[in-house]
Amino acid sequence: MQIWVDADACPSVIKDVLFRVADRLQVQVTLVANKLLRTPPSRFIRAIQVPAGFDVADNEIVRLVQEGDLVITGDIPLAADVLEKGGLPLNPRGEFYTKDTIQQQLTMRTFMDELRSSGVDTGGPAAFSQSDTRNFANQLDRFLTRTGK
């Protein structure tokens, strides 16, 4: 089991949590992005830089993820693809995407996109908070405990 990170939009505080977990539990954490990433020196942390382009980083994660791997992403279509491959997508706010809920989330995302394209101001997600970081860290800890890490 390893942890993949859709790093282009992942908050820095979440990356910091993952860096600490990588060394403490000796689990491989791989960040994938279309920009250069700074990572602490560790044999358990690596970064993959992909060419710029729509969904290039997402496609690389889908190509590399294996059954049982954890994928950190807030991207709902990527989460759906990860679920199809047997991976476990977790968003940076600490919520797992599941096969039971992903279709509803994809439908809502499409609906909100249609509203925005018709000129409706839908607002955006709430600002990322310390509570979100705590929720993520707690959910990650529970997951790693269940998997024996």
Curated annotation (Swiss-Prot):
Regions crossing the membrane: none
InterPro entries in alphabetical order: UPF0178 (IPR003791)
Pfam (any one): DUF188
Family indicated by similarity: Belongs to the UPF0178 family.
UniProt name for this protein: UPF0178 protein HEAR0259
Annotated organism of origin: Herminiimonas arsenicoxydans
